[in-house]
Regions:
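N-terminal metal-binding scaffold of metallo-dependent hydrolase/deaminase domains
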Residues: 1-41, 53-55
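Divalent metal-coordination and catalytic microenvironments
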Residues: 5, 22, 27, 52, ...
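C-terminal cap of metal-dependent C-N hydrolases
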Residues: 10, 359-404
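Alpha-helical scaffold segments that flank or form the walls of functional sites
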Residues: 54, 73-136, 157-169
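Active-site gating loops and adjacent loop-to-helix segments of metal-dependent hydrolytic enzymes
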Residues: 69-100, 134-149, 213-239, 261-264, ...
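Metal-coordinating catalytic core of metallo-dependent amide/deamination hydrolases
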Residues: 126-249, 253
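His/Asp/Glu-enriched, well-ordered alpha-helical/loop segment
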Residues: 233-239, 283-373
Length: 404
């Protein structure tokens, strides 16, 4: 039995359970409710009391890249950043480098409350070994480039081999999706193969889209339409699970198309600000019914993987974009980091909320720190959710549990 001053299950209506508790049996949540009820259900269970803290679902980072280039590619717009630093890095990256990077990034993520990461990276057998040992949940998405000039990326054959070796392993904690770095890095035939692989292995597809304004003109030049419409033409919106990173530059018709196709969006506010890419229309996406998750992007364009910091930035950026202080409020952004993030990756039936039968992915965040004070748990000024979003940081996480 896990208990704390407050439990936030992140179920509909956003209940706030005072002196609540979560009963964990094996790798799953057995029950959620009052401490008294949990003791009655399991009188012999071990009790762990986190005191003045908040228990909530583990955070879901819907777009990240392992790596270790922090502080080496600074103050550059996105296309120069890619051309001058990221592509050259990929040309010299070794399998050993890549595995070490995943160990570091997964450890950082767990320490700051992220239990599930969507990680687009290279040589990902090493990433799988890191996740298997560290215990995090990961959706691994190889950087695939199958077009002239991008032969230093992984291939679809590499991606398929990774699926065959690791998809569903570590008691289901490791999943492997089909990855395309970008539609510009793939031929039409490669796009068709990618979609076929999703169907063959019943897995998802992840790629970048509409990150920078320059992409719009490039898509018009290559395809005669917007990037989202080009993805549609190439068949890349057809798999059952599709997650698009960024989606900064969208019009109303494209937002409607994403909603119609049930496409998940990974919003990366720190990266979009740092690379001067723009600000995604989060309020419009949510209003249209699109599942929006939060992503840190990589450590080199953030420069950390702290999801508690990221949700604050996401909320503030939306308020500035909309010039509306009520935009993307605390409950909505917390939902993006938990249950809506789970929906964006097609795993809302397994993770993202504290409900019986779901995986026991749970974190505890201290509320006895100066930046979480005052900690008001009821009444008209109840501020638990506001303080989590606008006050807490990854260093306040005092417990991270994955699969029990």
């Amino acid at each position: 039995i896990l208990t704390a001053a407050i439990v936030l299950p992140m179920t509909p209506d956003n209940p706030v359970l005072q002196d609540g508790a979560v009963l964990v049996e094996g790798d799953r949540i057995a029950a959620v409710g009052s401490l008294g009820d949990m003791k009655s259900l399991a009188p012999e269970a071990e009790l762990i009391d986190y005191g003045q803290a908040v228990l909530l679902p583990g955070l879901i980072n819907t777009h990240s890249h392992s790596g270790f280039l922090r502080g080496t590619a600074e103050d550059l717009p996105v296309w120069d950043w890619l051309r001058l630093f990221i592509d050259p890095m990929h040309r010299v990256l070794t399998a050993e480098d890549a595995e070490i990077a995943s160990w570091l990034c997964y450890a950082e993520s767990l320490l700051s409350g992220t239990t599930t990461s969507v990680d687009m990276w290279r040589y990902m057998a090493g990433s799988a070994r890191a996740a298997e040992a560290l215990g995090n949940r990961v959706v691994m998405v190889p950087y695939v480039g199958e077009a002239e000039g991008y032969d230093y990326f992984d291939t679809l054959d590499d991606n398929e081999a990774l699926i065959q070796q690791w998809h569903g392993k570590a008691d289901g904690r490791i999943n492997v999706w089909v990855g395309l770095e970008h539609m510009y890095y793939a031929t039409p035939e490669a796009c068709r193969r990618a979609v076929a692989m999703c169907e063959r292995y019943n897995t998802g597809l992840h790629t970048h889209s509409n990150e920078a304004e320059a992409e719009i003109g490039e898509a018009m030049k290559r395809f005669g339409c917007s990037p989202i419409r080009a993805l549609e033409q190439l068949g890349l919106l057809e798999p059952e699970r599709v997650l698009l990173a960024h989606c900064v530059w969208l019009d109303e018709d494209e937002i409607a198309l994403l909603a119609e196709k049930n496409i998940g969006v990974a919003h990366n506010p720190s990266s979009n600000m740092k690379l001067a890419s723009g600000s995604a229309p989060i309020e419009q996406l949510i209003a249209a019914g699109v599942a929006v998750g939060i992503g840190t992007d990589g450590e080199k364009e953030n420069n950390n993987l702290d999801m508690l910091e990221e949700i604050k930035i996401a909320s503030l950026l939306a308020k500035l974009r909309c010039m509306d202080a009520a935009a993307y409020g605390a409950w909505n952004v917390l939902r993006s980091a938990t249950i809506e993030g789970a929906r964006a990756i097609g795993m809302a039936d397994q993770i993202g909320s504290l409900e019986p039968g779901k995986q026991a992915d749970i974190i505890a965040v201290r509320a006895d720190t100066p930046r979480m004070t005052p900690f008001l748990t009821d009444g008209p000024f109840m501020n638990v959710h506001h303080n989590l979003v606008h006050g807490a940081l990854g260093g306040d996480v005092c417990m991270t549990m994955v699969a029990g």
